[in-house]
């Protein structure tokens, strides 16, 4: 299975980059992992709704260039479905059993994802009703993907 994260912006903090590298290494046993970073747009402190829509649209265009037609696309969004770790593991397993060979997971920038990306997604996933920094969300998502593979392999880790 190929797993690709499509993310907006670069990870600036070393401790987050280290965690991403660690989970990427661990996942190498289970899947082929790729991470695509698209440029983020500078957002002024008190941006108007119209400007925020424009920023999300620009970031959305950059994301869309990397979405593959043959991939199952999961977008992270507050309005998405919340799953337990076991349910996420089952979702990944079921996708593989039904012939999916590539899953793309999309993490938006500080303003979230453009509606066009949400519409294109095959599945909307939410980790919480709360908002998380998108850089930290990469670590959380990679950890949960790793946990899912450990669950599916019946290996100790997730309890």
From Swiss-Prot:
The keyword Cell cycle does not apply. Its EC number is 2.1.1.177. Specifically methylates the pseudouridine at position 1915 (m3Psi1915) in 23S rRNA. InterPro entries: Alpha/beta_knot_MTases, RlmH-like, tRNA_m1G_MTases_N. PANTHER family: METHYLTRANSFERASE, RIBOSOMAL RNA LARGE SUBUNIT METHYLTRANSFERASE H. SUPFAM superfamilies: alpha/beta knot. It catalyses: pseudouridine(1915) in 23S rRNA + S-adenosyl-L-methionine = N(3)-methylpseudouridine(1915) in 23S rRNA + S-adenosyl-L-homocysteine + H(+). Gene3D superfamilies: 3.40.1280.10. This is Ribosomal RNA large subunit methyltransferase H. GO terms for cellular component: cytoplasm.
